[in-house]
Amino acid sequence: RSSSSAASDVYKRQIFDAAIVNLFFSDNAADAEILGLEGDFIYLTDNDWVLSGAFSMLDTELTKRLALTNDIVEGSELAFAPGYQANIAARKEWGMSSGNTAHWQGQVTISDDSFSDIMEPNRALQSGYSLANMRAGVSNDNWVAEVYIDNLTDKRAEISNTFVFDRERIMIVRPRTLGLRLKYNF
């Protein structure tokens, strides 16, 4: 069992110093049109390869400004909407004489340029990128042991960009990561 309660009584109207604390609000800023196509596939070959992938293509446009600001430009692209994105993976599994199953997998992901915001003062171009990952391992019904390399080329791809508190902050994908993954089913 648990329970909780809270009570508050606030008399002050100005509890933050507006000179140093930005006010955040969320509002519908614009109407937009989006024309797109997406798809995915999984294909199992006769020799135990699995090929899989997905893609999306987008054409976006801000069509009408709703917010009372000139910082939103009609005709510009939506934020975080790359013109295309795709990924493809190839995985091979084979039985071993020990009764275990070995596997190898490679994956490539690509993304086109995109923008970080629809507000012009906060809008930054996020360059397109491609990433590659690889893994190999052995498994059975009880456990999995796998070595992996994520971000094989060590690309510092920008995946998000904000101007929180009027300072640009860029988020990138994790750098090249090598690891060993062990999993045991109880």
How would you label these PLM feature ranges?
Residues S26-M119, K183-N185:
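Gram-negative outer-membrane beta-barrel transporters
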Residues L44-D46, S97, S127, V138, ...:
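Surface-exposed coil/turn segments at beta-strand junctions on protein surfaces, enriched
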Residues E33-L35, P82-A86, G128-A132, D141, ...:
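Residues that define the transmembrane beta-barrel architecture of outer-membrane proteins
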Residues F16-F25, A67-E74, P121-Q126, N161-R169:
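Flexible, surface-exposed loop regions and adjacent strand-edge segments
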Residues Q85-K92, S130-A136, R169, L180-L182:
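Feature captures outer-membrane beta-barrel proteins of Gram-negative bacteria and organelles
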Residues S8-D9, T109-M119, V138-F186:
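C-terminal beta-signal and adjacent terminal beta-strands/loops
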Residues K12, D59-L62, D154:
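Active-site micro-motifs of SAM-dependent methyltransferase domains
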Residues R1-A7, Y11:
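Single conserved hydrophobic/aromatic residue that forms the stacking wall/gate
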